[in-house]
Amino acid sequence: MMWYVGVVNGENTSMKGGKMSIRLEVWGENALFSRSEFKTERVTYDVMTPSAARGILEAIFWHPGMRWRIDRIHVLNPIRFDSIRRNEVGRVIDIGKIRTMAEGRGDGGAIYTAESIQQRSSTILRDVRYVIDAHFELNRAKMSSTDSAEKFQSMFM
């Protein structure tokens, strides 16, 4: 999965109601925003979730002295679904075995895919494009004396 990020019409920042706002366009070939009520099969929400939008913004710029708040998510492309099947490993390596291997003892608990492979179905979104409107709030207790909203805004850009 590949995501692309860009500013919208050159208007990617503004000051509204005393808070710094940004507008960011994101798009990609496929997307999956997992619904937690489906246990084994992965099924996507119809649109990007606010927590996914916040994750994208935090991947671009994160600081302990600020918190991203999502104001609005615009859906630009029609909502379309695809179903895919994937082979996945049905178990994970035990952390104790990894420690043993790190200490030079044992094999680390290798997983042999022929023994634990599982085929899983996923319902994903296809050809997605969103515009995220967001702002950030400051936590002065976690900021240095040189930090400011303007500084964070310029670093995001």
Regions found by a protein language model. Name each.
Residues 16-40:
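N-terminal, Lys/Arg- and Ser/Thr-rich interaction peptides
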Residues 1-2, 15:
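Methionine residue identity
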Residues 9-12, 16:
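Intrinsically disordered, low-complexity polyampholyte segments enriched for Lys and acidic residues
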Residues 18, 67, 124-128:
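A short, structural micro-pattern
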Residues 26-30, 77, 132-140:
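Beta-strand elements of well-folded, non-transmembrane domains
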Residues 3-4, 11:
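Short, positively charged and aromatic/hydrophobic N-terminal segments
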Residues 88, 98-157:
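Internal, well-folded beta-alpha domain core
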Residues 38, 43-88:
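Glycine/small-residue-rich interface belts in oligomeric ring/scaffold proteins
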